[in-house]
Design a protein with these regions (language model features):
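Class I S-adenosyl-L-methionine
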Residues: 1-113
Length: 114
């Protein structure tokens, strides 16, 4: 169709020339790496894990310990804050993309499509 598109998926997914976004780049407490493919040039974010501190996991069950260190969110409030989302329940948060990612993608798309 020639219209702009963006496809999101997880690392390892078969996308064409994807860019990656990470919550640590935006000051979020999640390391939710996501890939984005587009027919419009996008610039991904650079991970900032070293200054992020111990990330909060938003998957599985709340209050789980993570074998490699860290934990999943202890409360729904902690999960919402880590993701930058204040309206979702746990079941929605575990499937969500932080809005900061889509804000950045939208900003980049708008600058190209002007």
């Amino acid at each position: 169709s020639g219209k702009p598109y963006v496809i999101e998926n997880v690392p390892g997914a078969p996308l064409i020339k994807p860019v990656q976004f990470c919550g640590s780049s935006f000051g979020l407490m999640v390391r939710r790496h996501r890939l984005f493919e587009s027919n419009v040039p996008l610039v991904g974010s650079v991970c900032d894990h070293k200054t992020q501190g111990r990330p909060v996991g938003i998957y599985g069950s709340m209050r789980d310990e993570i074998p490699s260190g860290g934990h999943t969110a202890k409360t729904i409030e902690q999960a919402r804050e880590a993701m930058g989302i204040d309206w979702m329940l746990w079941g929605d948060l575990v499937e969500a993309i932080p809005p900061r990612y889509t804000f950045e993608i939208g900003k980049q798309l708008m600058s190209v499509l002007k």
